[in-house]
Regions:
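Charged, gly/pro-rich active-site loop segments
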Residues: 2-28, 97-154
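Structured helix-beta-strand junction loops
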Residues: 39-40, 84-85, 147
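Catalytic cores of transferase enzymes with a strong primary signal for eukaryotic protein kinases
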Residues: 31-33, 67, 117
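A generic local structural motif
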Residues: 29-32, 56-57, 75-77, 129-130
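Short, conserved active-site entrance elements at the starts or edges of catalytic domains
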Residues: 15-49
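A generic structural signal for nonpolar/aromatic side chains embedded in well-ordered alpha-helices
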Residues: 36-37, 82, 124, 144
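Short beta-strand segments
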Residues: 40-74, 80, 90-92, 103
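Short secondary-structure boundary/capping segments
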Residues: 34-35, 60, 80, 132-134
Length: 154
């Protein structure tokens, strides 16, 4: 899949239906969802294994425009899962309000690599640890377009 750039994502307001055409596409992150994603709570990312079983792992998460971003190594199980089947679910519980969990479902619409990826990787690492991410291993960023989002138990 061709990497997408931050500029292209921020400037592209075209959205085509994915899946059920009657399902309303979400083009903007809810402000409460954005606030939670931009906080320091660890998210849990669910993807689909080759046999159809769920795969859930903790991840650092953030926003990039109206998209959700996570990073990983290009050969990790989650990267392989998401490249094969782009459907994803994320959940997190904000530490300051554990009774308002956040759930986002969507699809990976692109991958950032190289300098574009490292800009986001460093931003997330600094948010969570106060320091840029150590160099050495390659990192890629999955860009997720939210299709459904929810705040609170329901």
């Amino acid at each position: 899949m061709t990497p997408v750039t931050g500029t292209a994502l921020a400037d592209d307001h075209r959205h085509e239906p994915i899946g059920n055409p009657r399902q309303e596409m979400i083009t903007m992150l809810d402000p409460d969802v954005r606030r939670a994603l931009d906080g320091t709570s660890i998210a849990h990312l669910a993807s689909v294994l080759p046999d159809g079983a769920p795969h859930c792992v903790p991840v650092w998460v953030g926003t990039h425009g109206d998209h959700v971003v996570i990073f990983t190594g290009p050969g990790t199980r989650k990267a392989r899962n998401l490249r094969r089947d782009p459907r994803v679910a994320l959940s997190l519980t904000p530490a300051d309000n554990p009774f308002q969990p956040v759930v986002v479902r969507g699809r990976v619409i692109g991958w950032l690599e190289g300098d574009a990826a490292w800009t986001i990787v460093d931003r997330l690492a600094t948010k969570y640890t106060g320091q840029p991410y150590p160099r050495g291993d390659e990192r890629v960023v999955a860009v997720i377009e939210p299709e459904r989002q929810r705040v609170g138990v329901g």
